[in-house]
From Swiss-Prot:
Segments passing through the bilayer: 39-59, 136-156
Keywords: Membrane, Transmembrane, Transmembrane helix
Miscellaneous section: Completely overlaps YIL177C.
Presence of the UniProt keyword Membrane in the record: yes
Top-rank lineage group of the source organism: Eukaryota
Cell division as UniProt keyword: no
Major location category of this protein: membrane
Protein name: Putative UPF0479 protein YIL177W-A
Cellular component terms (Gene Ontology): membrane
Location(s), subcellular: Membrane
Family: Belongs to the UPF0479 family.
Membrane-topology descriptor: Multi-pass membrane protein
Length: 160
């Protein structure tokens, strides 16, 4: 499991980028769907991440790749726009997968996945989406939410 210190360090990095950023990331829609007794749960990565500058996030992730490599799989790829004549191409997307966060289910070894998706659409509207999605056994859903809220509260208490 990822050390708590590294989790806090990654969150502090994103929060620091948010405080010094000029570009904003708009809120994404709430999505939820079930699949084979697992849940794919997408929601905005709230708090500071609503105002994270896109380039700084990518830069920090690249700089910290060697540190988080044992815990994250980082993949950068391009997604061209379907309507290039109307919208600027979708230049970059960043996907971070954090595996083996939770214990395996009773059915056997089922690797859990936590992914951060960063999609930057350089259209006139600058639609930027930053969302966290995770697929875990159903019993871990509330555990993860409680842990995430506790992590956020801890961050606020450290800064105050």
């Amino acid at each position: 499991m990822m050390p708590a210190k590294l989790q806090l360090d990654v969150l502090r990095t994103l929060q620091s980028s948010a405080r010094h950023g000029t570009q904003t990331l708009k809120n994404s829609t709430f999505l939820e769907r079930f699949h084979n007794n697992r849940i794919v749960f997408c929601l905005p990565f709230f708090l500071a991440l609503f105002f994270v500058p896109v380039q700084k996030v990518l830069q920090h992730l690249c700089l910290r790749f060697t540190q988080v490599a044992p815990y994250f799989k980082i993949q950068l790829f391009d997604l061209p726009s379907r309507h290039a004549e109307n919208l600027a191409p979708l230049l970059a997307s960043c996907r971070i997968q954090y595996t083996n966060c939770f214990s395996s289910s009773s059915n056997g070894q089922v690797p859990s996945i936590i992914s951060l998706y960063l999609r930057v659409d350089l259209s006139p509207f600058y639609a930027k989406i930053f969302q966290i999605s995770y697929r875990v056994p159903m019993i871990w859903l509330d555990v993860f939410q409680v842990f995430f809220v506790f992590l956020v509260i801890s961050q606020h208490s450290l800064h105050s």
